[in-house]
């Protein structure tokens, strides 16, 4: 498995742990449709949150949150709409789009299996990062 894939999986698992610590309930991971993918879907009360998770190592251009482009946002929104069509029990929920980002200030070796939790990283959780508008 490539280090980038390992980092992505670690970031999604760590983000889900963080969300659960904040009393969110897991609904789905890596929900796919023809239109795209949503990394995590969680709920709390009558809120349904679609979460994009990004992680970047030092040496990559830009910060992780900058990688959630307008095009990516549109794909996430379309995928969320498909999820709501497929699971109508969630249609009355208030929907929110969050982004959780992990930025590693150090370079990460590309050929070695890593325990990313041992690295220092900056965490940014942006609630309501984008909307349907």
Swiss-Prot record:
It comes from Acinetobacter baumannii (strain ATCC 17978 / DSM 105126 / CIP 53.77 / LMG 1025 / NCDC KC755 / 5377). Transmembrane segments: none annotated. GO terms for molecular function: nucleic acid binding. Belongs to the UPF0102 family. It comes from the Bacteria. This is UPF0102 protein A1S_1049.
